[in-house]
Amino acid sequence: MANTKSAIKRIKTIERNRIRNCAYKSVVKTFIKKYLKVLSDYTNAPNSNGVENIQTTLGIVYTKIDKAVKRGVYHSNKAARMKSKLALKYNVIKK
């Protein structure tokens, strides 16, 4: 246990930030799962508006990832890797 007042405050701050970071990560993971679901639905039954749904969902996922980077939840290189993997899946489907 912390002995000084500043160390006690620091523990509270760290715990608050940890919970916040977990929430941001959860949101990003949720939207990635939604994107992958849209992709799988399109591969099972291709239709004209499926591509539009994929593109809009991909844009939303990119936004969520970028906001997580801005808030310091993810490193920019990790975000770039995540976005690259998602774009690769889209490009494979598009061909």
UniProtKB/Swiss-Prot annotation:
GO terms for biological process: translation. Keywords: Cyanelle, Plastid, Ribonucleoprotein, Ribosomal protein, RNA-binding, rRNA-binding. It holds the Pfam family Ribosomal_S20p. InterPro entries: Ribosomal_bS20, Ribosomal_bS20_sf. GO terms for cellular component: cyanelle; cytosol; small ribosomal subunit. It is found in: Plastid, Cyanelle. Disulfide bonds: none annotated. GO terms for molecular function: small ribosomal subunit rRNA binding; structural constituent of ribosome. Coiled coil: none annotated. NCBIfam families: S20. Belongs to the bacterial ribosomal protein bS20 family. Binds directly to 16S ribosomal RNA. PANTHER family: 30S RIBOSOMAL PROTEIN S20, SMALL RIBOSOMAL SUBUNIT PROTEIN BS20C. This is Small ribosomal subunit protein bS20c. It comes from Cyanophora paradoxa. The gene is rps20.
